[in-house]
Amino acid sequence: MSTPRGLAILGSTGSIGRSTLEVVALHPEWYRVAVLGAHRSWQSIVEQAKRFNPDLVVLVDPEAAAQARAALRDCGSTARVECGAEALAAAASGDNVQVVMAAIVGAAGLKSTLAAVHAAKRVLLANKEALVMAGTLLMDEVRRAGAEIIPIDSEHNAIFQCMPGGYLPGDVARGVTRVILTASGGPFRCADAGSLTNVTPDEACAHPKWKMGRKISVDSATLMNKGLEIIEATLLFGLPETQVDVLVHPQSVVHSLVEYADGSMLAQLGAPDMRTPIAQALAWPARFASGVKSLNLAEIGQLAFEPPDHQRFPSLMLARGAARAGGTAPALLNAANEVAVQAFLDRRLNFTAIATVIDRVLQRLDSSPVKALSDVLDADAAARRLAEALIEPGSGVFA
């Protein structure tokens, strides 16, 4: 690389953001960190700014931004500090940025992701919720603006790697008959159904293979993570929901498979470490080191696969239903899930009731066509209001 490319890391203090910085630190000739963005973790972002010396630091929370501004001024940093969601979107589309790591969890990352796409950036998409909520709008804008999307989710990144040479998400996946997403099964893969009601947030977040944030860890435990990934796969790779399968694979070594019309099946294997898909996306179409230890298949010995249990984990079927319905249904599903998961983490809702809340929201709110971003945001807000009302003590829903 002659001149390092400007990189914006939105969600830099989260798990994906921190892993991205680890990989980037190995390759200063490839990337210069131009923007660091987060919600309110100002102490963490200040430490990152001291090390990587970005042009701009953005914190959505105004108080956190003020704290960061003072701390960086005191240490002599020249980084500008701005606040608010609009500043985050502006940073994602700035002239000093060529590549955007979109890693802000949940609906909060939607506007900045859309801004990066609109500005024709290469977007490394770790925020699956943005695609689930506004997938048709997002992918249409990718094609219109000439942006590039490279998925960071280990499963979708694996599919991307197994696609024909030169393929980019949004293109027609010619010759592909099926993609298979693998799931570890989460911490409750072997748990008795009756025991799931009383599991704690800490138990749900104790993933057997991956180190992740708490929200995505709960999604993995309910298998909603895989449900969102089904929707994501239909949008990224232009496949109907019926051509996206799920297999439970406890070893988390095979990250996904792609089946072709001639009967061939290609799989991508690797250690369960997010630095691998991050490095692949950062270097694409080349390759560089991720810092991840090589996979020892002889040591692993066996690879097992089994179908998911839809009775114990109903979130998968709820997500498939939303994928088939289209329109605002995925946004309703995502919003209800975010509210229910947070209520579970706050100990206001039991584990098995997460799916119940989502189901009730989908039953009560009709899906409608998506013609503009406002349609998605209105559906998101309505689903959040209803989910909160259902969870509220005295609602009678869980009596």
Name these PLM-found stretches:
Residues M1-A399:
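Catalytic, metal-anchored helix/loop core of enzyme active sites in primary metabolism
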